[in-house]
Amino acid sequence: MSDLSNFDVIIVGGGHAGTESALASSRMKCKTLLITHNVDTIGQMSCNPSIGGIGKGHLVKEVDAMGGIMAKAIDQSGIQFRILNTRKGAAVKSTRAQADKILYRQAIRHALEIQDSLFILQASVEDLIIKQNKVIGVVIPKIAIEIYAKSVVLTTGTFLNGKIHIGMNNFKGGRSGDLESSSSLSQKLRDLSFRINRLKTGTSPRIHAKGVNFDCMSVQNSDSPLPVFSFTGSFEQHPKQIPCYSTYTNKKTHDIIRLNLNQSPVYSGLINGISPRYCPSIEDKVVRFSDRDAHQVFLEPEGLTTSEIYVNGVSTSLPFNIQTEIIHSIFGLENAHIIRPGYAIEYDFFDPRDLKLTLESKFISGLFLSGQINGTTGYEEAAAQGILAGINAARYVQNKPGWYPRRDQAYLGVLVDDLCTYGTKEPYRMFTSRSEYRLSLREDNADLRLTTVAREFGLIDDNRWRIFCLKQENIEKERQRLRNTYIFPYSEDIVQLNRFLNSPIKNKVSGEDLLKRPEMNYVKLMQLNTFQSVKLDYQVFEQVEIQIKYSGYLLRQQEEIKKYLYYENTLLPIDINYHDIAGLSKEVIDKFNDCRPYSIGQASRIPGVTPAAISNVLIWLKKQGLLKKNVKCT
C-alpha cells in the first residue's frame, strides 16, 4: 500500500461485522482499507467460542450465500458440530458449531490477507472528516494522519466508550485484556445528530480443564453425520472433533449469588446500560427465576491446543473471589481454577432508527454502521449486518442504488427492518420466531434466495456460480423425474413400499405424491427400484424433499407474501411532509417523522400506527399522483 491518502471504502473495526464489510466491498472492486487497533485480534471471539444456533445459524447461511467468510471459517475451525431443533421441522432447524478460537481467527485473517483490493492498517480512528453532511475520511491522531475515502463503515463493537466491570471495580476497555476504548470517537459522534444510548453485555469465567471432574457430567458429542455450514464446504475440512459437557448450578450456587448481590455492579446501580434479555447473567437468572433450584451450565472447550474452557451459562460481573465460590459450588467444578474472570461491559450504541435499511446514516451521506454499534448482540448478527453495509458502501461509491433484502427474502431483511423500524432498547438477538415467513426462510435454501443477487453484485466468483447453477439444475431435474415416475399396485416394489406407509396404495402414485406423505422420506423412496437414480448431492435431495413435502404450506405462504409485497412496494417520497395529510394524529405524525419509513409496508409496522392512518396516507398519495410501485423487488 504505497498511497495512504485515498480509498473507496474505509472499514473501522476488525470484528465479525468489519471483516465481512471489508471482504464484500473489496470483492466488489472497491479499494478498501480495514483499520483495526490490533491486527492480532481480527476475528476475535470475545465471548463464547461458538457460531450459529437458533436463528443465528440462518444468518450464517445467508452470509455464506452472499459470498461471506463466516461459514467457511467455522468449517475450518469447528471442533463440535450439532443440528438444533431437528424435531421441529425444516423451517427452524439450525446449525451450531463450537469453535477453536485460534483456528477461527486465523481463517478470518487469512481470507483478508489474500483478498485483492483490500488493505489492513493497525491504528485507532478518533474522528471522522465530514463536509456538508458527507463523510470523506477518518482522523488517526496517534500517527498524525488523515485518510480519505468515498464511504466509511463503522463496526466498532463494544469499543465505543467501553467500560468493563468486575465487582465494584471498573476500567476503560473494549473487552478484557484489551484496554483500547474510543471515547473521543464516541464524543465526536455524539456532537452530530445521532441518538446514542448505553447497553450492557457480559461474559463467563474461563477455567482450566485440569481441575474439572468430567466424569459426573453429561457428554455432548458432534452429530453424525457431521454438519457443514458453508454451501461449498465439506466435513473433511473440519479439524479434530471433541465433546462439550453439561452440568448444573444448585441451591448452594444460588445462595452464594443472593448473599452477594450487593456487590454486583448491575444490582448496586453501578451499571446503567440495559442487559440482553436472552443471554442473562447468572445473577439475573437467580433473581428472575427464583423458583428454580438449578440452571444448566455448558463447558465449552476454547480450542484443540489450549486447556481453557468457557463456562457457558455463568455470565457474571461479581467480584473475582465470589466468582471462585460460584464456580466451586457447581457439580464437577469443585477444584476448578479460573484463568480469566467473567465481567460485564457497558458501551455506546446508536439508535438504528437513524439509519436507512441499507445501514447508511440518514444524516451523514456515505457513513454506514453495522454490528453491535446498532444495538445487536452476537457474532452472527454482526456478520450479517457487516456484509450488507459492505455491499452498500461499495454501491454508494459506484453511484448505484442501495440494496437491502425484504422480510420475506432473508432473516437479514427481518433483522434490519426490525432495527430500523422499531429501534431497540436492549441488545437485539435473532430468533426464527421473529420472522412471519420462516417456512420460506430456511437454512437449506439461503443460497436459492440470495446467491443470484450476490452474483449480480460481484460477490460470487465463477466457480461458486457454476456449482450453484448445477445445484439448481439438479433440483429441477429430480423434481421433474419424481413427478413423472409412478409406482403401481402390481409393481415389484409394492410390498416394500407398503411397509413404509401407514396405509397401502390402491392406485398408481408418483414419487412426488409419495414424498408428501409424512411417514415417507427421500432415503426410503430411493430404496425402491422404481425410483432409484444416480446418487445425488445431499443438498439436492434435501431440497427436493423439503420443497415437495411442504409444497402446500409454501404455496399458501407465497399468497401471504404477495399481499405483503403490495404494501412493501408502495414507496413513500423521501421528502414527504406528513402534516399535509389530513386525518393523521400528532402522535402518528411524530412516529412517521421519527422513523421516516421508506414504504407503506414499513409505515404499517411502526408501533402505534393504525390501519386508518395508513388508509389516509394511501388516499393522499393517490390524490397527489405519488402512488408509485417499486417494480424490481430485490
Swiss-Prot record:
Gene Ontology BP term (one): tRNA wobble uridine modification
Amino-acid positions noted as binding NAD(+) in the UniProt annotation, renumbered to this chain: 275-289
Residue numbers binding FAD: 13-18, 125, 182, 372
Essential cofactor(s): FAD
GO cellular component, one term: cytosol
Keyword NAD: yes
Keywords: Cytoplasm, FAD, Flavoprotein, NAD, tRNA processing
PROSITE patterns associated with the record: GIDA_1
Predominant localisation class: cytoplasm
One Pfam match: SAM_GIDA_C
Cell location: Cytoplasm
Record GO terms (molecular function): flavin adenine dinucleotide binding
InterPro entries, per database record: FAD/NAD-bd_sf (IPR036188), GIDA_C_N (IPR049312), MnmG (IPR004416), MnmG-rel (IPR002218), MnmG-rel_CS (IPR020595), MnmG_C (IPR026904), MnmG_C_subdom (IPR047001), MnmG_C_subdom_sf (IPR044920)
Complex formation: Homodimer. Heterotetramer of two MnmE and two MnmG subunits.
Family: Belongs to the MnmG family.
Function of the molecule: NAD-binding protein involved in the addition of a carboxymethylaminomethyl (cmnm) group at the wobble position (U34) of certain tRNAs, forming tRNA-cmnm(5)s(2)U34.
Protein name, as recorded: tRNA uridine 5-carboxymethylaminomethyl modification enzyme MnmG
